[in-house]
Amino acid sequence: MGSVRASSLTLANRSGDVKCSVAYLLYFSFAMTPKSKPGKRAPRKGPRVKLVAQAALPTRHGRFTIYGFKGSGPEEEAIALVRGKLDGKTAPLVRVHSQCLTGDVLGSLRCDCRAQLELSLKKIGQAGSGLLLYLPQEGRGIGLMNKLRAYQLQDGGMDTVEANETLGFAADARDYDFSAQILKKLGATKIRLLSNNPEKVRQLEESGIRVVRRVACQPRVSKTSRAYLQTKKSKMGHLLDGL
């Protein structure tokens, strides 16, 4: 894969460095990009995946390289955090993570998104190599405002699946073909996938990625997120233990 030259970036104020979480930086890298309506895709023209930039990203889980990718459609953009070298021979540990402003950045306990993000980075850091894809798929692909509307319905007694469907969306509107193209560009065509979602495994394999092993990504369950996770297990087939 080709490389893009990038200068180092320091965030600082008068009193010293500003400390931002990885989740905060990842989420707001997408914040200023115009989004089309959920489920609407522009016609694809030209190459599916374009490397836009790369830079060093030291984190508390180790040193990563951060890559920015864009595709042909307005919603096709993603960030990859790569640790170590991807030699194409071994199967790296991979997390394909959908952004969640309320969880990843604001610390919401309605879901386990932030806990999964942190657990994934920790595992990849400890392994010494691997990668995390961070995708703008807020609310399982329905967008931030619609996710908040779904929250409002859940406050009225619906579960996460019923709320999405009441709003006219699928329970899970995400597509992982773009993710697969990025993995191929990075040379990760066979992987160990950090996921509890068999649908994610299926879609990646259909797009040409060999998932040699699914690695459970199940942080400790909180009282607040238990019902949400039970719904994902019973209605969406997620592989979750102890629920």
Task: Please annotate each region the language model reported.
Residues L11-R14, V22-Y27:
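Short terminal hydrophobic/aromatic SLiMs and anchors at protein ends
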Residues C20-A23, D172:
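A general marker of short, structured functional hotspots
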